[in-house]
Regions:
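Signal peptide processing junction and immediate N-terminal pro/mature segment
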Residues: 22-35
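Bacterial N-terminal signal peptides that target proteins for export
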Residues: 2-14
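N-terminal helix-cap/turn-to-beta initiation motif at the start of protein domains
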Residues: 33-47
Length: 165
């Protein structure tokens, strides 16, 4: 959140300078994605992540993880080879029922807990089920370990997402 606040404050003076990564963006091109890109480094879960199909090893989607008020959320940004054009979360219930998968929030409520993020929830759009979850960076920040579970973490399932370049 500090990065977003700093960048928003600096936007009002005419340019954005992200000193940590040496990025300059003109005010006309300033977007929240610039803040995400600047924050995407080996110590941060923020940024774009490739989700990998366990069975085929192929990339299924890109999920963008953002932070607001210290809480991480993740939204599907792009789908690769969807089974139907413009797929929706037809198995979801409640407010997410039949929402388009692109733009759907699938991670929410994750808080920093040392070198990981815990206390969040994970939506599996293929089943419509919601799980408790934890996130942790691996391989020098190149991979994100997502562990979803019901009840106790021991009985869950883990996926590894790869940072998108």
């Amino acid at each position: 959140m500090k990065l977003f606040c700093t960048i928003r404050a600096m936007t009002t003076v005419g340019s954005i300078a992200a000193v940590a990564v040496g990025v300059f963006v003109s005010p006309a091109r300033a977007r929240p994605q610039a803040a995400i890109a600047a924050a995407s480094n080996s110590a941060s879960a923020l940024g774009r992540w490739k989700t990998i199909d366990d069975a085929t090893g192929k990339v299924k989607s890109i999920v963008e993880i953002t932070e607001q008020d210290g809480v991480l959320t993740g939204t599907i940004e792009q789908l690769f080879d969807p089974p139907v054009p413009h797929p929706t979360c037809y198995l979801c219930t409640g407010a997410k029922k039949d929402l388009p998968l692109v733009g759907l929030q699938v991670l929410w409520g994750f808080h920093a807990d040392g070198n990981s993020w815990t206390g969040g929830m994970v939506l599996d759009p293929e089943t419509g089920k919601i799980y408790r979850g934890s996130l942790a960076l691996e391989d020098g920040g190149k991979q994100l370990r997502l562990h979803g579970y019901i009840g106790i973490p021991l009985l869950g399932r883990t996926e590894h997402w790869v940072r998108a370049e």
